[in-house]
Amino acid sequence: MTDSSVGIGCETALMLARNGYYTYAGTKNLSQARDLSHISKEEKLPLRIIKLNINSTFSVGFAVKKILKEQQNKIDLLVNNMGYVLLGCFEDVSINEMRDQFETNFYGTVRTVRSVLPFMRKHKSGKIINVSSIAGRIGFPVSSAFVSSQFAIEGLSESMRIELEPFGIHVSIIEPGMVRATNFMHSMVIANKAKKPSSPYSNITRKLTKNIEQMIGMGISPREVAYTVLKAAKSDYPLPRYIVGDDAAMIMENRKSMTDTEFDKFVKNTILNV
C-alpha cells in the first residue's frame, strides 16, 4: 500500500490488516505514520510500516525486494493511493509543476506496478488496485494537471487489465468523489502563478478553492473508500471500476445522460456556483 500515513491510505492499510492481510504500509516519511503505528501495535495487527518514496525507482525497488524476501517471493495485492492534487488553471501551471504532478500521480504508480508485476505474473495471480478519482473520468476546472494525471491512470489501468488477464492478474480502479478528511486540504497544492492576484484566472481559482473546502465537509469518509478497496481485494472477480460516494455516482449519471454542453453547464453550476 502506497502513501499510507494518513487519510485514505491509513484507513485502507488498517482495513486490510484487520481483515487478515499481512500489510506493508508504505510512506515517504516514517514520522508521519505515528498514528498508524500506534493503532497497529495496540490492536496487534499484521502490519508493517516501510519507507517508500514512489518518486524514486531505487526506493520502490528496495522496498519491494525487502517484501519479497520476507514473503517467499510473492506479493498478492498492490494498492496505489492517489497522490496529491495540483490546483490551478492550465495557463497558470508551469511545465515543471505539471511534470511534478505526473511524476507522483502517474509515474509513481508505474514504478510500483513494474516492480511487482514480474512476480505476480510468475505466480499467475495478483490484484492491482489503483485509487484514482472521479476526476479520472471527467474534466473539472482549475485542476487540469490533476485531472490529466488521473485520466492517465484510467487509461493505464484499462490497458493493463486486458494485457494481464491471461496471467490471472486483476486490475481495478477506485473512483471516489469528495473525501471528508482533516488532511485533505494538505494534499492539495496551488500552482505558484495561480496564487497571484494578477493571474487572469484568480477569481475562478479563489472561488473553486473556497467551494472545495466546503464540499470536503460533506464528503465521504476515508473508511468508505477503504472498505471498497477491501471489497475489490476479497473478490475472486473484482470489477474494473468502483465508484464511491453519492456525489461521484450522481456526477457520472449526469455525464451519461447529458450532452457535453449540458454537462459543462452542470459542472459550472455545481463546482463554481455560476
Predicted features along the sequence, with ranges:
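Conserved glycine-rich cofactor-binding loop
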Residues: 5-7, 29
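SDR active-site lid
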Residues: 166-239
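Substrate-binding pocket helix/loop in short-chain dehydrogenase/reductase
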Residues: 89-90, 97-99
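Conserved glycine-rich Rossmann-like NAD(P)H-binding loop of the short-chain dehydrogenase/reductase
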Residues: 19-35
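Active-site helix of classical SDR
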Residues: 113, 149-152
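The beta1-alpha1 cofactor-binding region of Rossmann-like NAD(H)/NADP(H)-dependent oxidoreductases
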Residues: 52-62, 95
